């Protein structure tokens, strides 16, 4: 198995291990984060109904404007601020953070810190 495949399998194992322990509710939805090489995505998910309450990503025009590159920590921080703003508009202040198997470092940490600075608690 190649080293890339091993990393992907390890991430999926971490993802399932974390997902068994946390769930989102209407009062405290799950803040799910996904990152690719060029973009980062965040969603607020109510697991009882399976509904996405709010989402933000570097593909959105309001987040992407002013960024020269969308795959770095600066872009992740803008996504964190945007998802926090959308959550506060829906009167959501507390969430459960789901790093989706990614290590809490770099872009994931930047998104989480920006969301906390803009009013979300987790």
From Swiss-Prot:
InterPro entries linked to this entry: Ribosomal_uL18_bac-type (IPR004389), Ribosomal_uL18_bac/euk (IPR005484)
Gene3D superfamilies: 3.30.420.100
Annotated S-S bridges: none
GO cellular component: cytosolic large ribosomal subunit
Keywords: Ribonucleoprotein, Ribosomal protein, RNA-binding, rRNA-binding
Keyword RNA-binding: yes
SUPFAM superfamilies assigned to the protein according to its UniProt record, in alphabetical order: Translational machinery components (SSF53137)
Subunit structure: Part of the 50S ribosomal subunit; part of the 5S rRNA/L5/L18/L25 subcomplex. Contacts the 5S and 23S rRNAs.
Protein name listed in UniProt: Large ribosomal subunit protein uL18
Organism: Citrifermentans bemidjiense (strain ATCC BAA-1014 / DSM 16622 / JCM 12645 / Bem) (Geobacter bemidjiensis)
Organism placement in taxonomy: Bacteria, Pseudomonadati, Thermodesulfobacteriota, Desulfuromonadia, Geobacterales
Gene: rplR
């Amino acid at each position: 198995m190649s080293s890339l495949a091993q990393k992907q399998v390890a991430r999926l194992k971490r993802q399932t291990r974390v997902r068994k322990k946390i769930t989102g509710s209407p009062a405290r939805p799950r803040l799910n984060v996904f990152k690719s090489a060029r973009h980062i995505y965040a969603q607020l998910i109510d697991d009882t109904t399976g509904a996405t309450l709010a989402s933000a990503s570097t593909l959105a025009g309001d987040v992407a404007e002013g960024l020269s590159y969308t795959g770095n920590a600066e872009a992740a921080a803008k996504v964190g601020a945007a998802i926090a703003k959308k959550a506060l508009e829906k009167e959501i202040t507390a969430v459960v953070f789901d790093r989706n198997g990614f290590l809490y470092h770099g872009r994931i940490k930047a998104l989480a810190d920006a969301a906390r600075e803009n009013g979300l608690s987790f």
